[in-house]
Amino acid sequence: MMQRWVLLLAMLVSVAGFALNHYASQSPDSKSTHTSQSEFSAERAFDLLARLLGDESPHPVGSAENARVKDEILTWLAEQEIDATVQQAWGCAHSGSRCAWVENIVATLPGKHNGPYVALMVHYDSVPPAPGAGDDGAGLAAVLEAARLLKASGPTQYPVMLIITDAEEAGLLGAEAFFKQHDLRQQISAVINIEGSGSSG
């Protein structure tokens, strides 16, 4: 009798654990584009991703389509009244075997204090055979929606920087150019890099 009770209890705990795990792993419902401007909206980010991707052509570094994506990002940042500049520089791999002319977008949001920046980093170029929706378009759209929210919510404690690099797929060349050459590179206390890591999970 005791063994049956223990077995039943173990089964009940297992089922409850499975149900709790299943519930905890569910994504929350996404917020619509009509959600308050003071909240993050996945649907707003998805709409922005569609705008950035255009006709879904690949946009590797140096291509006309990559220039279009860059201009679309700059237009969107201007619409949000977020200050942005373009760093134009040669970016080279450590070995010097690969170099490219890169156009990184650097945007800043002021904070209540003048302390170092917290940087959100993402890239906008794609690999040559794909439009880059997952790597790194979705990350880019999420970072831009987060920036919109931060701007709408008023200043954060410390300033925030968006580092939107070019030529990531060619070997992190945009990041190399930023961290070796940009005037603000030593005014950053933390970097949160948002990178595509596949589309299967």
Regions found by a protein language model. Name each.
Residues 50-110:
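A non-catalytic alpha/beta surface segment that caps or lines the substrate-entry region
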Residues 111-117:
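Proline/glycine-enriched tight loop/beta-turn segments at coil->beta junctions
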Residues 44-51, 68-79, 84, 138, ...:
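Extracytoplasmic/secreted proteins, especially bacterial periplasmic and envelope-associated proteins
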Residues 38-45, 59-70, 99-100, 117, ...:
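Solvent-exposed, acidic/flexible segments
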Residues 18-70, 80, 124-126, 199:
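N-terminal capping segment at the start of a domain
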Residues 126-201:
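Acidic/histidine-rich catalytic neighborhood of metal-dependent amide-processing enzymes
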Residues 117-123:
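Short beta-strand element of the alpha/beta-hydrolase
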Residues 4-21:
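Hydrophobic membrane-insertion alpha-helices, especially the h-region
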